[in-house]
Amino acid sequence: SFPTRRSSDLMNTAAVVGFGYVVKSTVGFQNLIDMLSNLGGNPLISFASATTLIAGATGSGSGGIGIAMEVFAQKYMDLGVNPAVLHRIAAIACNGLDTLPHNSMVITCLAACGMTHKESYKPIFITSVCITLIGLAFAVFLGIAFN
């Protein structure tokens, strides 16, 4: 028989993936995409910001990178951004805000460990959001300096 814990984890993941698809289909999400499409400033900074915000909104790094590359990649390549640099920035940026409390990995790990968000989210936030965003800032700096 299928263990209860595993079916619960599977349901958590399915629910959060479904959440990402629902978010993507809303007017508010389209407004976010429109706003992010008009970010000015350095292309790498605006692309990194857009990618990580999309990942945060969908609660998914893979969803964030997929949407960002589909919507923004050609625009930034047309501005002269090296495609390899763009990809590296996207790969880091999609992990910046993807582990907010509604992320399926966070929910599943906490459920598997029998912990609550209140008990355990702070160290998750520090290691997976704060440190990743610091790394993203460094990668953007290097991309600007050497692009």
Predicted regions and their residues:
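Hydrophobic core segments of alpha-helical transmembrane domains in multi-pass membrane transport
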Residues: 13-20, 47-55, 128-142
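Membrane-interface helix termini and inter-helical loops of multi-pass transporters
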Residues: 22-38, 146-147
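Structural signature of hydrophobic alpha-helical transmembrane segments
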Residues: 31-42, 85, 91-101
